[in-house]
């Protein structure tokens, strides 16, 4: 599933082609996604794009009459293509632009979303989200306060959008390794110093992944069709049985609630 770096990479890739251009019309080939494509999107006509923003894993296209909310789901990607390029099997939605380009949404598993809202504030998919991990609001003091009475393991807590948004399975595993914290540690057992380190590491890992265009494991592609290259820098995720790059101990993989967790027994305590 695309996580925050992949969504931010998509945002940065499509923004220069959309802002200042006008959506002439939308083409919806298959509106049966995780939620049905909003009827307002079918009827889009002559709508200039004012901005392309991101909140958590949602892309937000600001138009004069409202907002398009896009979620990439498990396997979705957005590409900027020439208008004349014919669609393929899993190309479900196009925004045809005034500059001769098309924003094309591809989603083999159809678990993404294209929604419409007049006002962002209060929309149900955005209403209960925690702070952005790259913002000043997410810091060691905040994390320590939120962990203090939490009797659950730190890794699933990091992946809870009510704590902080966009830290999915890959980046939770990588950040905990970089901070030397075992993923099964109780959140309440973390000291303030550990929380300060973990908050800094999460920011650093996410920023590095954004620099590398995100992580491509299977489906994700950048807006220009290229993969994300952070997969080449993964320290533990997807490396079961391979030697730790720090100490040489084989990486361990466990599964909790259908989620794979990767860690080093030696480096993470």
From Swiss-Prot:
It comes from the Bacteria. It holds the Pfam family H2TH. DNA binds at residues 90, 109, 150. A zinc finger (FPG-type) spans 235-269. Its EC number is 3.2.2.23, 4.2.99.18. Involved in base excision repair of DNA damaged by oxidation or by mutagenic agents. Acts as a DNA glycosylase that recognizes and removes damaged bases. Has a preference for oxidized purines, such as 7,8-dihydro-8-oxoguanine (8-oxoG). Has AP (apurinic/apyrimidinic) lyase activity and introduces nicks in the DNA strand. Cleaves the DNA backbone by beta-delta elimination to generate a single-strand break at the site of the removed base with both 3'- and 5'-phosphates. Keywords: DNA damage, DNA repair, DNA-binding, Glycosidase, Hydrolase, Lyase, Metal-binding, Multifunctional enzyme, Zinc, Zinc-finger. It catalyses: Hydrolysis of DNA containing ring-opened 7-methylguanine residues, releasing 2,6-diamino-4-hydroxy-5-(N-methyl)formamidopyrimidine; 2'-deoxyribonucleotide-(2'-deoxyribose 5'-phosphate)-2'-deoxyribonucleotide-DNA = a 3'-end 2'-deoxyribonucleotide-(2,3-dehydro-2,3-deoxyribose 5'-phosphate)-DNA + a 5'-end 5'-phospho-2'-deoxyribonucleoside-DNA + H(+). The active site is at 2 (schiff-base intermediate with dna), 3 (proton donor), 57 (proton donor), 259 (proton donor). GO terms for biological process: base-excision repair. Belongs to the FPG family. SUPFAM superfamilies: Glucocorticoid receptor-like (DNA-binding domain) (SSF57716), N-terminal domain of MutM-like DNA repair proteins (SSF81624), S13-like H2TH domain (SSF46946). The keyword Zinc applies. Binds 1 zinc ion per subunit. Monomer. One of its GO terms (molecular function) is 8-oxo-7,8-dihydroguanine DNA N-glycosylase activity. Its cofactor is Zn(2+). This is Formamidopyrimidine-DNA glycosylase. It comes from Escherichia coli O1:K1 / APEC.
């Amino acid at each position: 599933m695309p996580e925050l770096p992949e969504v931010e990479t998509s945002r940065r890739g499509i923004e220069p082609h959309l802002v200042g251009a006008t959506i002439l019309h939308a083409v919806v080939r298959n509106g049966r996604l995780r939620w049905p494509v909003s009827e307002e999107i079918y009827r889009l006509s002559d709508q200039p794009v004012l901005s392309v923003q991101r909140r958590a894993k949602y892309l937000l296209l600001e138009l004069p009459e409202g907002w398009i909310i896009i979620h990439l789901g498990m396997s979705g990607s957005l590409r900027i293509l020439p208008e004349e390029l014919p669609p393929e099997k899993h190309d479900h939605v196009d925004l045809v632009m005034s500059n001769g380009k098309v924003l094309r949404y591809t989603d083999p598993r159809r678990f993404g979303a294209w929604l419409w809202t007049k006002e962002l504030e209060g929309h149900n998919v955005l209403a209960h989200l925690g702070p952005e991990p790259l913002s000043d609001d997410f810091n060691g003091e905040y994390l320590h306060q939120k962990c203090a009475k939490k009797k659950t393991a730190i890794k699933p807590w990091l992946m809870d959008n009510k704590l902080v948004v966009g830290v999915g399975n890959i980046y939770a595993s990588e950040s905990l390794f970089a901070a030397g914290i075992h993923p099964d540690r109780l959140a309440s057992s973390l000291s303030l110093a550990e929380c300060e380190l973990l908050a800094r590491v999460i920011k650093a890992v996410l920023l590095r992944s954004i620099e590398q265009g995100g992580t491509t494991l299977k489906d994700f592609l950048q807006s220009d069709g290229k993969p994300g290259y952070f997969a080449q820098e993964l320290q533990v995720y997807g490396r079961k049985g391979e030697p730790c790059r720090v100490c040489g101990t084989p990486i361990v993989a466990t599964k909790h609630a259908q989620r794979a967790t990767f860690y080093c027994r030696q480096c993470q305590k």
